[in-house]
């Protein structure tokens, strides 16, 4: 298990740290202990390696703290990424036997609050910070529901039922609505308005689409539209407010998709497992702008920063600069 720091301008490796795990759990499917994405506050970087736990480094590669979490992981391992919110480091820790939503102190890794999950707990979704307009909430798909939690205490505020075990996509939000999708059976996507308490399944769901439109990738909300992607390269664009399907197209790159779409400069970027990058206009009418091949297996979601898009394949890290 490795943590590597690169110079964003040159690609030079600045430092590399090995995390020596006594045991690396076997995982099924396409998962691995290094699936979760690191997160940074600009001073430190926080990484999660499944059953090994959390590790924090400063930007010079010095270990600040580590937090064992041996109870995390299940048949398919862990895939949830850590998230920062104020002084909190949030993590969805689930397993076949049990699990919890953890809020740790960014400075020390110590627990600030810990909310146990009800059975069945297995979930691969990452916590999502939702600004409702009346305050922020932590949203997570777990235990057959999408749930909202108080970030100060971890107390459950509301829930929407009907979600299966093992959901992978992370929620998204825009225009005052929250979007949550299921990639298992039953497969669907819902839009939820804020303000509810308790079970709001019948009161706060604004629209619902009952056909499967996502696989592993999370939905993307941008420019008044919601984009969803499933295996086979089938992409769906919704009107984010009404749920109307504006278009559904099969991209030139078929096959499986694990990376979530990202947006920048009015475009949506999607990457197939085979490393085919499709660039789509973030518009109410389908527009295929370009298709490029990395020629390498790609599971990680792209990242956009400083006018560049960073793509991690199984073999390499690429930085692609936009036109000036």
Segments (PLM) and residue ranges:
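Noncatalytic, solvent-exposed loop/strand surfaces
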Residues: 1-324
